[in-house]
């Protein structure tokens, strides 16, 4: 069952029940007036209208949580389907939810699809068993096919740059390839190695823990305040561990912690499992699943590494500010980590037993939603100064 509530009208509510078909996944449409649910066993996708209570069915979706992509303007949606052992893409108009066209794609086992930012092309890629990235026009013409290598695990993550000039392709070979939108050939290959020796202008931030030292000489306390401080120092409260977490800038060369995946288990934790572009399209963040505690930030203007963040725990989630070149990440600890071109910082969440396992920005980049296993909280972040923005855009 899926339930929806109105923020402005608390008395309004909606319940969606597919009955025996079940619901494996649900998502909003861009206009927030429709909910798309995928039934169990990928039997159908149902589009539910919250205005007219009408519904439209799309048969045989390829995936439950993947294989659906909306255009940037929200007018069209592409849905990957499969029938008769063949992959297809259905194009629907979101105003009527009518099928505008359907075309077959040259994939063995389609993994996902995504519209380009300018809504002119659709990127389709195959399962990890077949390295294949296909670029289609909305009318079904195959414009380009890219294959970096054969006979090995292939594509793992794909992401368009905000301007649509580059298509980032992360693979199981621990390499990110940036394809140009004119030639559809790689303009850069970013290799993730465990021994990093440069470039010289890149910065490595390493998370460290250290005792919190309070310089009493720098404080001015009256007699009552001093007595209270002494009594507080004798407390057995667990909050007074006096341990702080911060980033330390370390020099090259740097050895990145590396984990070798077991060869006898499926879905190996290797390759580029996280790939995202900054709002201005200048920076690209990547995470190599072989190195789960490291987050790589690449400068597209210079085609080189800009920063490397080394955490004490596995990086759970990382997300760019939707407005500024600012990155937030979490590791399942009680800390929030942030990076900008000016530097990086660690912030402690002032809530007891709160472990940040996931996060999400709001649309204007002024606040973050932090998720724990059983709770959530909102944090407000300051806007970047004009000086920081100009510095980040100063090529």
Protein language model regions, located:
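WD40-repeat beta-propeller superdomains and closely related acidic/aromatic-rich repeat-like regions
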Residues: 1-395
């Amino acid at each position: 069952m899926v339930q929806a509530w109105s923020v402005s009208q608390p008395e309004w509510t909606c319940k969606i029940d597919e009955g025996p078909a079940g619901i494996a996944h649900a998502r909003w449409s861009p206009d927030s007036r429709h909910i798309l649910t995928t039934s169990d066993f990928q039997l159908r996708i149902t589009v539910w209208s919250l205005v007219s209570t009408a519904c439209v069915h799309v048969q045989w979706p390829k995936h439950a949580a993947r294989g659906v992509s909306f255009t940037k303007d929200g007018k069209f949606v592409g849905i990957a389907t499969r029938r008769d052992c063949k992959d297809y893409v259905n194009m629907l108009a979101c105003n009527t939810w009518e099928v505008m066209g359907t075309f077959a794609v040259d994939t063995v086992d389609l993994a996902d699809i995504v519209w380009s930012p300018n809504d002119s092309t659709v990127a389709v890629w195959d399962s990890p068993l077949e390295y294949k990235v296909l670029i289609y026009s909305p009318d079904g013409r195959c414009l380009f096919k890219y294959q970096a290598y054969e006979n090995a695990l292939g594509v793992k993550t794909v992401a368009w740059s905000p301007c649509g000039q580059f298509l980032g392709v992360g693979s199981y070979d621990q390499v990110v390839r940036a394809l140009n939108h004119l030639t559809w050939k790689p303009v850069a290959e970013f290799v993730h190695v465990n021994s990093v020796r440069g470039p010289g202008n890149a910065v490595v931030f390493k998370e460290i823990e250290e005792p919190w030292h309070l310089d009493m000489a720098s404080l001015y306390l009256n007699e009552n305040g001093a007595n209270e401080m002494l009594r507080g120092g004798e407390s057995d409260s667990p909050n007074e561990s006096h341990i702080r977490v911060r980033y330390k800038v370390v020099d090259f060369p740097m050895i990145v912690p590396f984990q070798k995946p077991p060869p006898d288990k499926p879905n190996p934790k290797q390759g580029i499992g996280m790939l995202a572009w900054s709002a201005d399209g200048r920076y690209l963040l990547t995470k190599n699943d072989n190195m789960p505690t490291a987050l790589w930030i690449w400068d597209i203007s210079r085609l080189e590494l800009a920063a490397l963040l080394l955490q004490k725990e596995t990086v759970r989630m990382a997300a760019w500010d939707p407005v500024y070149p600012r990155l937030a990440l979490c590791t399942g600890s009680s800390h929030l980590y942030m990076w900008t071109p000016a530097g990086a910082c660690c912030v402690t969440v002032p809530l007891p037993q709160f472990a940040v396992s996931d996060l999400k920005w709001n649309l204007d980049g002024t606040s973050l939603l932090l998720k724990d296993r059983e709770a959530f909280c909102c944090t407000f972040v300051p806007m970047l100064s004009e000086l920081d923005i100009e510095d980040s855009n100063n090529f």
